[in-house]
């Protein structure tokens, strides 16, 4: 009797006892055979579904709610502690013959003082990498005091490295662009690729290596161009589109569910236990618009979430303690939205089942 709605990660059973059951079964087989190809107008299909439900249920569509501001990435930064063990001009001149002198020179230029967080991070990494060789040279020259000053400065940079990495990656303009909401979802998620997944994974690998090998100078090497290119790829990421899509789904499916609950309480489809023309129309709307159009899009969104969120969490997790509280609150809001998708759909399916449960075939 029942036909099944399958989404990876959960199984939902939708009982449609009228003639539309055959159409539903056919649509499900089509979905399986075609790989559940993503529709290109998910939000529009949700709107059409709501409008058709309004006509058949006689219940007005609940008010439209705006996108929650709590789901927008907060614009915050983590202040970097001031450097101790400063190198003065005389010490700088004594570094002749050390590659580190070039690094310090770049830091003290106008460009160095106004460098982006990502460029400052690369300068810090280079500084840490170059200190051991320069320190050894200074000790050979009989200047252990300056060597010790450099070593202490290097340790200071290492201690604040989580903050430096967080400012460069998770609080930088590229990450902000990654989570920026698009004006419209258009073909999303059919218009995405695996390139952003690869970029996130590579950034995570770099960050993890920098954090895990603090005592190994040879492991600090960072290709400036590679790092900046990876950051630039974040600008084309679809984090904002994913959150926007899930917010729309949660809002509109919840609105549809509220309409069905109201109908079931005040004007059931089959008040005398037999199917009606109204129940048949409702059956057709669910089969055609929810199962045939919306459900494949929901499956595609879930698949994209699983692909995207895993590397995002891997990148964020080691840096969480270095992030401001506002960012932690935002990630909680974001992840709660993305995780309650299944519950929202299940509740809607349950409302559909209840609506048709008293409609025996005549």
Stretches found by the model and what they are:
Residues 25-31:
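Sec-dependent N-terminal signal peptides
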Residues 33-35:
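C-terminal motif of bacterial Sec signal peptides marking the signal peptidase cleavage site
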Residues 39-64, 233-362:
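A cross-kingdom marker for long, charged
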Residues 40-194:
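N-terminal Sec/ER secretory leader and immediately downstream segment
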Residues 47-51, 55, 132, 136, ...:
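Polar/charged alpha-helical tracts
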Residues 155-261:
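Extended, low-hydrophobicity segments enriched in charged/polar residues
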């Amino acid at each position: 009797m029942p036909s099944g709605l399958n989404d990876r990660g959960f199984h939902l059973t939708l009982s449609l006892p009228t003639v539309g059951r055959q159409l539903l079964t056919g649509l499900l087989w089509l979905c399986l055979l075609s790989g559940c190809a993503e529709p290109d107008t998910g939000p529009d299909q949700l709107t059409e579904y709501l409008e058709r439900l309004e006509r058949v249920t006689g219940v007005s569509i609940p008010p439209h709610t705006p996108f929650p501001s709590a789901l927008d990435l907060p614009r915050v930064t983590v202040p970097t502690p001031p450097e101790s063990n400063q190198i003065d001009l005389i010490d700088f001149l004594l570094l002749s013959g050390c590659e580190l002198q070039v690094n310090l020179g770049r830091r003290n230029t106008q460009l160095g003082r106004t460098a982006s967080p990502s460029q400052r991070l690369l300068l810090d990494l280079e500084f840490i990498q170059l200190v051991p060789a320069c320190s050894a040279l200074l000790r050979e020259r009989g200047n252990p005091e300056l060597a010790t000053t450099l070593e202490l400065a290097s340790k200071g940079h290492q201690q604040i490295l989580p903050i430096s990495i967080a400012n460069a990656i998770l609080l930088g303009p590229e990450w902000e662009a990654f989570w920026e909401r698009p004006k419209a979802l258009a073909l999303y998620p059919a218009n995405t690729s695996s390139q952003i997944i690869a970029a996130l994974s590579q950034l995570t690998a770099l960050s993890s290596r920098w954090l895990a090998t603090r005592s190994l100078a040879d492991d600090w090497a960072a290709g400036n161009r590679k790092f900046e290119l990876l950051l630039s790829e974040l600008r084309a990421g679809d984090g904002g589109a994913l959150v926007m899509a899930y917010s729309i789904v949660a809002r509109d499916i919840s609105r549809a569910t509220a309409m069905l609950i109201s109908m079931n309480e005040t004007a059931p489809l089959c008040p005398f236990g037999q199917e009606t023309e109204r129940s048949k129309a409702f059956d057709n709307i669910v089969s055609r618009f929810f199962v045939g159009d919306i459900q494949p899009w929901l499956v595609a969104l879930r698949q994209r979430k699983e692909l995207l969120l895993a590397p995002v969490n891997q990148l964020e997790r080691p840096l969480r303690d270095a992030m401001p509280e506002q960012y932690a609150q935002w990630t909680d809001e974001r992840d709660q939205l993305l995780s309650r998708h299944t519950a929202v759909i299940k509740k809607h399916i349950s409302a559909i089942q209840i609506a048709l449960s008293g409609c025996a075939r005549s």
